Amino acid sequence: MHIGQLIGVGVIKSMINRDDQWAYRIPYGLQWMWPLPLFIGILMAPESPWWLVRRGRTEDAKKALLRLTSVNRDTDFDADETIAMMVHTTALEKQITTGASYWDCFKGTDRRRTEIVCMVWAIQNLSGNSFSNYSTYFLEQAGLDASKAYAFAMGQYGINMVGVFGAWFLMTVGLGRRTLYLYGLCGLCVMLLVMGFLGLVPHAHRDQASLATGSMMIVWALFYQLSVGTVAYSLVAELSTRRLQIKTVVLGRCLYNVVAIICGVLTPYMLNPGAWNWGNYAGFFWGGICFLCIVYTFFRVPEPKGRTFAELDLLFERKVSARKFADTQVDVFDETIESSAFQQYQSQKPAVMDASQSEKVQYS
C-alpha cells in the first residue's frame, strides 16, 4: 500500500532545512514508535483457523473462527461444518502435494506455467520499477531542488495508493488481468520514453523539463500500480498449478529478487554524475526493456479471468495459445468423462480382443 514509504518521504522532506545531526537522527528515531503498537496488535490478533487445523487443534480452530466471524441469525453459518471443510481441504492438499519436488515445476505443462509466473514477477522490476525507486535522486539530477524532488516523491507514493485501489476496482468490474497487465506495460513504456526524450530539451529550458519529468514519474507510478504492480500478484496466484503452487511462487519470487539486485546495482551507475551520468537518457534504456516485456506478455501471458482452476489446467494441457485463452471453450465435465471413457476402453481393449478370438475358435 506504500503507506510506510509515504510517511518516510514526508518525514525526510521536513528535515531538508536542518543542517545539524538531528536531520538524520529524527527520521531514525521515529522508527522506534512503531514496535509498541505492532506488539499490541500482534497480542490482540486471533490465530489463523487454518494454521490451527493443520496442526490438529480443531477446538482451538473453532474458537478462532467464531472470534473472526460476525454471527448473524439470518445466515446459515455453522462453525462445525466450516471446520470440517477445513479439515477435509487440508487432507486433500496434503495428499495432492505429497511427493512434489521443485524439479516437477520444470516438467511437462508445468514448465510453461513456472516460466510465466517467474516472468510476471520479474517484469515488475524490468518495467522500470528500480528506476522509480531512485526517483528523488533522479529528479535532483534532472534539475529540481531537493524540496521539490521530495514533494514529487510524496506525490508518487500517494498516487501509488490510489493506483492499488484503482486496480482492485477495475478487476472487480470485469477487466481482465492480461488486459490490465499488457496495456499497463504499454503505458509504462510510453512514459519511460517520454522521460528519455525530455533529456534532449536544451539546457535553457532545463527547469521546465525537470518539472515535466517529475510529472511523468507520477503518471508512471499511476500506470504501474493500476497494472503491473498490483495485477502481478493475481496472475501468480491463478496461473500456477495447485499441486506446485507454493514451489512455483518461491521460484518466481527468487527470480524477482535476483532481477531486483541486478537492477538495483545498475540504476545508481546510470544516474550518478560521477559514473555513467545518463540522467533522463536512462528512460530510453528502461523503455526498451519495457518494450521487450510487452512482446513477451503479448505472446506468453494468458487471461485467467473467469476460469476455474480445472479449466486452466485443461487449457495448459491442450497447449492453447496465450492469446486464445479468453475465447477457448472448455467443458471440464465432458473432458473428464471422455478421457476416462477412452482410458477405460484402452485398458479393456486387449481383453475384448482375446474374448472375440476365443469365440471365433469355438465356432470354427
Where do the model's predicted regions map?
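Alpha-helical transmembrane bundle of multi-pass membrane proteins
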Residues: 1-66, 91-364
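Short intracellular "coupling" helices and adjacent cytoplasmic loop segments at the cytosolic face
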Residues: 68-82
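Cytosol/matrix-facing amphipathic helices and coiled-coil assembly/linker segments
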Residues: 79-92
